[in-house]
Structures are given as structure tokens and as C-alpha cells.
Amino acid sequence: MISDDTDQFNPRDAKSPEIAKGKSAKRREARQMATQALYQRHMAGHALNEIEAQFRVDNDFSNVDGTYFRELLHGVATNQTEIDTALKPCLDLTIEELDPIELAILRLSTFELLKRIDVPYRVVINEGIELAKVYGSTDGHKFVNGVLDKLAPRLREVEVKAHKR
């Protein structure tokens, strides 16, 4: 069972729909917060720890997987060169030409595809699309979907092929 004071998840708990749903909802909130924080970092250029601290003070984290938020935020920053290198072949624009919020979403999703193989690629794509619907431009979700659809087979070839069988 998951307790309120830990972010640990026992796979046996997934049998309980409420627990599994609660975990995924907290992860979705973590992705939303991380997207906003990455956008802020891109626009304002503040230090990562400063942005993280500000988000934790300014926002209610009771429904956020705080550990996952931190992993996403710091993981994207630490692996940004690798992330951008993976993204470039799937883009018709340069990284610099991308809308900053869509860039934040793509970097976050790419990080998950690269480093969080426990998260199914279809979940990563869906979460990226949902983030773009909320925060992106009018058709930003279509753009994000197109890029992630090209990227997933490059980064998760075996998983994508297995799913298509």
C-alpha cells in the first residue's frame, strides 16, 4: 500500500484502480509543473534549484508526485544536449525556432522516452499531447504528436515494434 508520506510505489498496488489512478494523476501533475518550470527556466534563465524552490513554495504539491517533478526537472536539464540531439532529426524547425512551451513539452517527453523506460511510450506520447492541449498553441498538440510519433520508434524501437504486432 502507498502511504501518504512516501513516493514509493509497489507494483502489487496497481491491482487497486484507485491507487493506480492516484499515482498516475500525481505523475500528470508533476509533468504539468515540470513543463511550467522548464518553460520558466528557458524564458528567464534562472538557476534550476531556484526555480524548483519557487515552485514548491508557490504551488500546492499535495497532489503532485514531488519526487517525479524533481527527476523530470533536473533530468531534462542534465540531459538537455542528449535530448536535443535526439529531437533534431524529428523536427522541421531548429530548436531555437520552436515555441518555448512546446520545446519544454518535447524535452520532457524525450527525457521520459530516453531515461524512463518503465513509462510506456504510448503513455509518454499521450501525456505530451495532453500537456500541449493545455499549454501549447492552438495546434501545438498536433505538432507535439507528430514529433513524438517520429521519435518513439527511434528511441524505443523494440517496444514500438512489439506493440504494433
From Swiss-Prot:
<dbReference type="GO" id="GO:0006353">
    <property type="term" value="P:DNA-templated transcription termination"/>
</dbReference>
<keyword id="KW-0805">Transcription regulation</keyword>
<feature type="region of interest" description="Disordered">
    <location>
        <begin position="1"/>
        <end position="27"/>
    </location>
</feature>
<keyword id="KW-0804">Transcription</keyword>
<dbReference type="GO" id="GO:0005829">
    <property type="term" value="C:cytosol"/>
</dbReference>
<comment type="function">
    <text>Involved in transcription antitermination. Required for transcription of ribosomal RNA (rRNA) genes. Binds specifically to the boxA antiterminator sequence of the ribosomal RNA (rrn) operons.</text>
</comment>
<dbReference type="InterPro" id="IPR035926">
    <property type="entry name" value="NusB-like_sf"/>
</dbReference>
<comment type="similarity">
    <text>Belongs to the NusB family.</text>
</comment>
<protein>
    <recommendedName>
        <fullName>Transcription antitermination protein NusB</fullName>
    </recommendedName>
</protein>
<dbReference type="InterPro" id="IPR011605">
    <property type="entry name" value="NusB_fam"/>
</dbReference>
<feature type="compositionally biased region" description="Basic and acidic residues">
    <location>
        <begin position="10"/>
        <end position="21"/>
    </location>
</feature>
<dbReference type="Pfam" id="PF01029">
    <property type="entry name" value="NusB"/>
</dbReference>
<dbReference type="GO" id="GO:0031564">
    <property type="term" value="P:transcription antitermination"/>
</dbReference>
<dbReference type="GO" id="GO:0003723">
    <property type="term" value="F:RNA binding"/>
</dbReference>
<keyword id="KW-0889">Transcription antitermination</keyword>
<dbReference type="InterPro" id="IPR006027">
    <property type="entry name" value="NusB_RsmB_TIM44"/>
</dbReference>
<keyword id="KW-0694">RNA-binding</keyword>
